[in-house]
């Protein structure tokens, strides 16, 4: 784990799901050496939300959604794509935030022990020259194995990071390899209806970062 990244507290997740979904934008998702800045989220809240997996009650699959907050909820869709969610709200109330998109900004090499050769370069002039723009992949820089890409869609995100069903029910709080961290990055976002569903389509529970992210303002 990069020593500058500190996992969010359980209290962060144990709140109103829409607040959590909004405040996750701009947060860093760290997974086994890969780092991403979250840019799109959706809320799924309670048994009264027809699009929520818990709408039909507590099952073996949805048990994790009933708490405690701050755990991962990973499931398979269409028999081929994994989706990553973070459990929210208080114990006993089923809710989660779906992570729909992110900017992947580094590979495992950036978090090696030898920060004098890698990490320090990212926080110096190299990082100041890197801009992440909408719908653009920038594959080569003068830092070894650095990749920058925008990932749209929860299935693509999990595929790129390597997240699968084995990463379901993971505690994101007491973890060095899978967690979310705050780097004080505030990003403008728009609010829309959720997509890819057939029920509860009227709810404005999708949050999407509206502007490109400028790495000149990021330090971690």
Curated annotation (Swiss-Prot):
Signal peptide: none annotated. It comes from the Bacteria. Keywords: DNA damage, DNA repair, Hydrolase. It is an enzyme of class 3 (hydrolase). One of its GO terms (biological process) is base-excision repair. CDD domains: AAG. Its EC number is 3.2.2.-. One of its GO terms (molecular function) is DNA binding. SUPFAM superfamilies: FMT C-terminal domain-like (SSF50486). NCBIfam families: 3mg (TIGR00567), PRK00802.1-4 (NF002004), RPE5 (TIGR03776). Belongs to the DNA glycosylase MPG family. This is Putative 3-methyladenine DNA glycosylase. It comes from Rickettsia bellii (strain OSU 85-389). The lineage of its organism: Bacteria, Pseudomonadati, Pseudomonadota, Alphaproteobacteria, Rickettsiales.
